[in-house]
A protein has these predicted regions:
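Basic, polyanion-binding surface patches
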Residues: 1-174
Length: 174
């Protein structure tokens, strides 16, 4: 029997990859948040979109510096995903709090999270007001991944990428 869903209808579109979204302020100070709302939207030009709460520090930084990185972790970084998802970077260095190491990206100023297995570096193409969120469309400047987990352009079963089901539920891609 089908039942109408009136709250959290977006959960029908889950699971989504849980990832780190990195940004930086104008001085280059790093920030990281946990996110699951992202999708490719165009191959030519290569565009992705991430949706971020308007009041978040990350949204403020992306609007200022116009760059961000999608960092795809494995389950080894699950604790750090939770820390970065429960804390604002406005007053706390989340890299330090989550015990993450940031390393230089190839084409943008925001750092990439060491230990992730995939990275998508983006320059802001367009920001769209989308209810309580901004939808940040990013032009992909560079995308790369760990070849131990990618074969023929696809993730291998051993990647163990966290998938967010909604709420506090996470499963792993296998």
């Amino acid at each position: 029997m089908l039942k109408e869903i009136t709250l959290d209808i977006y959960h029908l579109l889950h699971p989504k990859i849980a990832f780190f979204l990195t940004s930086a302020d104008k001085k280059g100070n790093p920030n990281v948040m946990t996110c699951a709302w992202a999708t490719p939207v165009s191959e030519e030009p290569p565009l992705v979109v991430v949706c971020v709460a308007k009041e978040s520090y990350t949204a403020e930084l992306i609007k200022q510096t116009k760059e961000f990185v999608i960092n795809i972790p494995t389950k080894k970084l699950l604790k750090a995903l939770w820390v970065c998802g429960k804390t604002s970077g406005r007053d706390v260095d989340k890299f330090k709090k989550a015990r993450l190491k940031g390393i230089g990206a190839i084409r943008v100023k925001p750092l990439v999270v060491e230990g992730c297995i995939g990275y998508i570096e983006c320059r802001l193409w367009k920001a769209v007001d989308a209810g309580e969120c901004y939808a940040f469309f990013g032009k992909v400047l560079s995308a790369y991944g760990d070849d131990n987990y990618i074969q023929k352009g696809l993730w291998t079963k051993s990647a163990e990428i966290p998938l967010h089901l909604g709420g506090s539920r996470i499963v792993y891609f296998k």
